[in-house]
Amino acid sequence: MDTKQIVIYPNDILTTPTKKTDLETAQKIAVDLFKTLAKEGGLGLSANQIGEDKSVCVVNVTEPFFLLNPKIIKKEKEIVYREGCLSIPDKMVRTDRYEKIWVEADNVDDTMVFGPEKDNQVDNDVLVLEAVCVQHEIDHLNGLTIFDREYKPEQYRRTEKKYGRNEMITISKGKKTLTLKYKKGISYLEKGWKINE
């Protein structure tokens, strides 16, 4: 089986947005991507990861598919995820992602929705994984890596000067609300909870 070499970070092609392309070119690149993905054992791969400056990526979580010139048009529910990347071997990064996304691509007629669904036969954890994988690959096509999405707990501690460690705060996430000491609330803030001002 003819496969391509994976481009390893750092490399300019991984940090530069890819160019739009046509369906015929995309289909040829997708074949190479799927072959390479099968050999490397990943869940997704983008064209620039095999040296092609084209906006094409493949994903194989619940089923194999490719996306041509994709863009995310809507996102829902922020989450922190743990990701690896074939172009950044032996490295796992906690990333800021979304649990559910809506995507448009030139090779599909309708908007594609990735993420958990009610009454779905597929495990919701798998559907979230697929949504994260699609975000990961579209990031590649936009010249971004997992380092650009790295979750930084410090950004949730900006209020530290306003609150003493033992001061009581009220935090919320969705419909859940908690009241506790600030020092105990930090771990919740790192998971996306917000202080009720």
What are these language model-derived features?
Residues 1-179, 183-197:
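Positively charged
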